[in-house]
From Swiss-Prot:
Interacts with PPP2R1A; this interaction might decrease PP2A activity. PROSITE patterns: LRAT. It is a single-pass membrane protein. Keywords: Cell membrane, Cytoplasm, Endoplasmic reticulum, Hydrolase, Lipid degradation, Lipid metabolism, Lysosome, Membrane, Mitochondrion, Nucleus, Peroxisome, Transferase, Transmembrane, Transmembrane helix. Residues 1-131 are cytoplasmic. PANTHER family: HRAS-LIKE SUPPRESSOR - RELATED (PTHR13943), PHOSPHOLIPASE A AND ACYLTRANSFERASE 3 (PTHR13943:SF31). The active site is at 21, 33, 111 (acyl-thioester intermediate). It comes from Rattus norvegicus. GO terms for molecular function: lipid binding; N-acyltransferase activity; phospholipase A1 activity; phospholipase A2 activity; phospholipase activity. Specifically expressed in H-ras resistant fibroblasts. It catalyses: a 1,2-diacyl-sn-glycero-3-phosphocholine + H2O = a 1-acyl-sn-glycero-3-phosphocholine + a fatty acid + H(+); a 1,2-diacyl-sn-glycero-3-phosphocholine + H2O = a 2-acyl-sn-glycero-3-phosphocholine + a fatty acid + H(+); 1,2-dihexadecanoyl-sn-glycero-3-phosphocholine + H2O = 1-hexadecanoyl-sn-glycero-3-phosphocholine + hexadecanoate + H(+); 1,2-dihexadecanoyl-sn-glycero-3-phosphocholine + H2O = 2-hexadecanoyl-sn-glycero-3-phosphocholine + hexadecanoate + H(+). This is Phospholipase A and acyltransferase 3. Belongs to the H-rev107 family.
Amino acid sequence: MPIPEPKPGDLIEIFRPMYSHWAIYVGDGYVIHLAPPSEIPGAGAASIMSALTDKAIVKKELLRDVAGKDKYQVNNKHDKEYTPLPLNKIIQRAEELVGQEVLYRLTSENCEHFVNELRYGVPRSDQVRDAVKVATVTGVGLAALGLIGVMLSRNKKQKQ
């Protein structure tokens, strides 16, 4: 099935190994996105190193160059929850930011936060939220296992 042609203002999710990179489509094949120093076209797994930097550059590049060999899709997943800002405002703000160096934090100011703020006026990252949930569930599970282990150990000692 062919990938639907993105429209200006659409959020583009690019499937990198181990995470998704996000951009906003601005027309004529171009996207605007946050590019930490290692986020080069087709970077793949190497771009996970972007987690180690606190700065990013807002870049306007061809979608095909940013995606490289990775698959991508239009993903305006929050349209039911938030009303997108007017298209001219989305594009104008995105274009004004091109070339600027901005703060980059994996957990609070990443590429997904960036594009959601442009489209909806709300910076949010489901990848970060989901990772926190997994870490919390894992931590609670490990704590429960530890508690069970201590209780079984005490019970065994009491029987001896």
